[in-house]
Amino acid sequence: MNIEDIFANNRTRSCEYRRERRTVSLRRAIELCNGEGRRGLIAEYKRRSPSGFSTDEDISSYLSYVKMHRIAGLSILSEPTHFSGSFDDVTLAHRIGVPVLVKDFAPDDHFVESAYNAGGDAVLAILDFLPSEDVERIVRRSADLGMDVIEEYHDRKALKKFVDGDNVILGYNRRDLVSLKTGEDQDMPQYDITILESGINIDNVVHVDMRYSGFLIGTSILKRDGTLEYLEKNRII
């Protein structure tokens, strides 16, 4: 997976306005969960990933399943080449009314506008790959549109490019997007709303770090391995 090629392609992608509702804050949804003593769960849909996962489940079936559970939001992969996603998936997902993260490699503020037009409520800014100037533009444009930003990192050195904001969530991705290997948990940085991403499944969910405000989980939910039900039954979410 060539990250530079993905960014270059995303700079040429666009989406005309087709959202059907106002934005719904993902950050606020997680805060509300935390206020009730729970963690916010972001349920992710993807058709495939470079790590080797793939599914034949269509997005409508997935949405019907997860909306019956306590989720704070949805993460929808919209990158077409490596994840077989599209802005069409975002538009479909935003109709159920929960916050939608457009999970993609946002290269600039123009991509934010397309994510908004498609129906997104939040975008992803990957600190490991973006210059701080672009992160700041993404945060500002998102705020203008009423959207949130998950500023994600894998390498702690990337945190020097972190841009604070009232619409910002800090996410730690345990997966290295270059090597695609999943690393061990790190010491959680101090921030008011934080999420843990990648590698949470039924085999390790009992040990999940409860210091995080929320979790982003995709593969294990798509596999129906019981992780979602475990989190719900034990009132973690």
Swiss-Prot record:
Catalytic reactions on record: 1-(2-carboxyphenylamino)-1-deoxy-D-ribulose 5-phosphate + H(+) = (1S,2R)-1-C-(indol-3-yl)glycerol 3-phosphate + CO2 + H2O
GO biological process: L-tryptophan biosynthetic process
Record-linked PANTHER family: INDOLE-3-GLYCEROL-PHOSPHATE SYNTHASE, TRYPTOPHAN BIOSYNTHESIS PROTEIN
InterPro entries attached to this UniProt entry: Aldolase_TIM (IPR013785), Indole-3-glycerol_P_synth (IPR045186), Indole-3-glycerol_P_synth_dom (IPR013798), Indole-3-GlycerolPSynthase_CS (IPR001468), RibuloseP-bd_barrel (IPR011060)
Signal sequence segment: none
Molecular-function GO terms, alphabetical: indole-3-glycerol-phosphate synthase activity; phosphoribosylanthranilate isomerase activity
Identification of the protein by name: Indole-3-glycerol phosphate synthase
UniProt enzyme class: lyase
Lineage per the UniProt record: Archaea, Methanobacteriati, Thermoplasmatota, Thermoplasmata, Thermoplasmatales
